[in-house]
């Protein structure tokens, strides 16, 4: 979890509100519980857990938006500038519902619901 604290610090340094799930809910909460909370509170899920993208596809959900890191190095020192750029560039998509996949070579944006 410590590297997530580094992400939260990076987001806050760029005036982006961020909170780790451990401050909100149970550590062992099911993914659908986290997704429901994020949808209801209009938060974007930032994760390296591929299950959130799968849940979006299976449920045809229109929210919440998910930013998914698909790379071995998930540290903000490696991806921070890319993620901050994505948050700024795709802000309107994230507000209306999107799955954004970040990796070392290319970033993909898919509008929700996924088909």
Where are these regions (language model features)?
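N-terminal first-folded block
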Residues: 1-44
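Short, glycine/charged-enriched secondary-structure capping and boundary segments
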Residues: 10-14, 33-35, 59-62, 82, ...
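Conserved beta-strand termini and adjacent loop/short-helix elements that scaffold enzyme active sites
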Residues: 21-24, 69, 102-104
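Residues at secondary-structure transition points
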Residues: 25-33, 50, 74-78
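Acidic, metal-binding active-site segment of PIN/NYN-like and related structure-specific nucleases
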Residues: 39-56
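Mid-chain, well-packed structural core segment of small domains
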Residues: 53-87
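Charged phosphate-binding loop/patch that engages nucleotide di/tri-phosphates or the phosphate backbone
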Residues: 89-115
